[in-house]
Amino acid sequence: MTDDKDVLRDVWFGRIPTCFTLYQDEITEREAEPYYLLLPRVSYLTLVTDKVKKHFQKVMRQEDISEIWFEYEGTPLKWHYPIGLLFDLLASSSALPWNITVHFKSFPEKDLLHCPSKDVIEAHFMSCVKEADALKHKSQVINEMQKKDHKQLWMGLQNDRFDQFWAINRKLMEYPAEENGFRYIPFRIYQTTTERPFIQKLFRPVSTDGQLHTLGDLLKEVCPSAVAPEDGEKKNQVMIHGIEPMLETPLQWLSEHLSYPDNFLHISIIPQPTD
């Protein structure tokens, strides 16, 4: 991969200032103060909120505590989506800090998966990494790794260790020089305006005549409604990690540098904010 290490670091160390508030109907023995945290964009809510859980459990009776879950403006937050994706999709036009409501009862079974332990997060994360490598390298790279390499990827993410993670992840970002890129680009496109969870299709980074495909090419093919006509006004923002990459950016470069740790490009299409 081309080595723009500063970009990789900026992506990894991206943080969202967040204020956690206990839901007003939760029963407490004394008033629950809000809890403030800088959330890592590349991680998962249930992986980085142990302190939040402990903070609120201090003012609650044991019998009133069941599985913790989070909500933003009435929408339950899917823990298996990376934090940065959740923010871009649901809250990118709101003021900071991001205000998240904490619940300990009435778990929304229809909307959320249960997350009883960190093992569940690890299993989900590794499943995504394996799916991404199946698309990129027919699973050859991930299958050639040892168990300890898989563990190092996970521990690097869990403990927020950039160098530990990238020592292994860089192997997943390599490809033979003669091929100009991966077999297919692992991506998911999310929209708040549709019931469909996300769009995911096979898409190559290089065209049959050897031209590098761009982000714009991908959107025109799989989500044409996201792209403004040449003479029309822009109706949507296309966001990855809180920024709007230029539509001319090669998809291969984006995949190598702006993928989340699960090796997918998580792309949010959100309505253009009206001033």
From Swiss-Prot:
**Primary location recorded for the protein, binned into one broad class:** cytoplasm
What residues form the membrane-spanning segments? none
Q: Which Pfam families match?
A: ATG5_HBR, ATG5_UblA, ATG5_UblB
What does the PTM comment of the record read? Conjugated to ATG12; which is essential for autophagy, but is not required for association with isolation membrane.
Q: Output the Gene Ontology cellular-component terms.
A: Atg12-Atg5-Atg16 complex; autophagosome; axoneme; phagophore; phagophore assembly site membrane
Name the UniProt key words of this record, in alphabetical order. Answer: Acetylation, Apoptosis, Autophagy, Cytoplasm, Immunity, Isopeptide bond, Membrane, Ubl conjugation
Q: Which domain of life is it from?
A: Eukaryota
What residues does the Glycyl lysine isopeptide (Lys-Gly) (interchain with G-Cter in ATG12) crosslink join? 130
Q: Where does the UniProt annotation locate this protein? A: Cytoplasm; Preautophagosomal structure membrane
InterPro entries, from UniProt? Atg5 (IPR007239), ATG5_HBR (IPR048940), Atg5_HR (IPR042526), ATG5_UblA (IPR048939), Atg5_UblA_dom_sf (IPR042527), ATG5_UblB (IPR048318)
Q: What does this protein do?
A: Involved in autophagic vesicle formation. Conjugation with ATG12, through a ubiquitin-like conjugating system involving ATG7 as an E1-like activating enzyme and ATG10 as an E2-like conjugating enzyme, is essential for its function. The ATG12-ATG5 conjugate acts as an E3-like enzyme which is required for lipidation of ATG8 family proteins and their association to the vesicle membranes. Involved in mitochondrial quality control after oxidative damage, and in subsequent cellular longevity.
Subunit structure as annotated in this protein's UniProt entry: Forms a conjugate with ATG12. Part of the minor complex composed of 4 sets of ATG12-ATG5 and ATG16L1 (400 kDa); this complex interacts with ATG3 leading to disruption of ATG7 interaction and promotion of ATG8-like proteins lipidation. Forms an 800-kDa complex composed of ATG12-ATG5 and ATG16L2. The ATG12-ATG5 conjugate interacts with RAB33A; this interaction is bridged by ATG16L1 and promotes ATG12-ATG5-ATG16L1 complex recruitment to phagophores. Interacts with TECPR1; the interaction is direct and does not take place when ATG16L1 is associated with the ATG5-ATG12 conjugate.
> Which PANTHER family does the protein's record reference?
AUTOPHAGY PROTEIN 5
What protein family is recorded? Belongs to the ATG5 family.
The protein's name is Autophagy protein 5
- Its gene is ATG5
